[in-house]
Amino acid sequence: MARIHTRIAHQRKDFLHKESKKIANSYDIVCIENLNMKEMSQDMHLGKSVHDNSWGMFTDFLTYKMERAGKKLIRIDRWYPSSKTCSCCGKVKEDLQLSDRIYECVCGNRMDRDENAAINICREGIRISGMMLDIEKKIS
């Protein structure tokens, strides 16, 4: 049994190295949420499914690969309401539940919740970095 767990751990580590390398080679700037997975697993009662996802290891790999390549990794504060903010109009939806997988706003925006959050994380990273870009062309 221990041999199986070791093999799985090596496969996971290999996968995380390959994916972080792919991202570091493809982008000059990467924006991620600064998540505390241990706290999330306790607070949200998500248990092992969240705790066992290797997010910390992935971000460590991505951090050193971006640094070695002279590229920038921007961490967005975990309290930034990326999922609750409409990526079209900026309105914050306070009553968004974890079970709501589709984000719907009064402005008419309707999209996958994670896609909406990703757009907001990208915009916040651009704001933090002070870059002046045509955001709509870069995100769309």
Model-based region annotation:
Residues M1-S140:
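Positively charged, helix-rich recognition surfaces that bind polyanionic ligands
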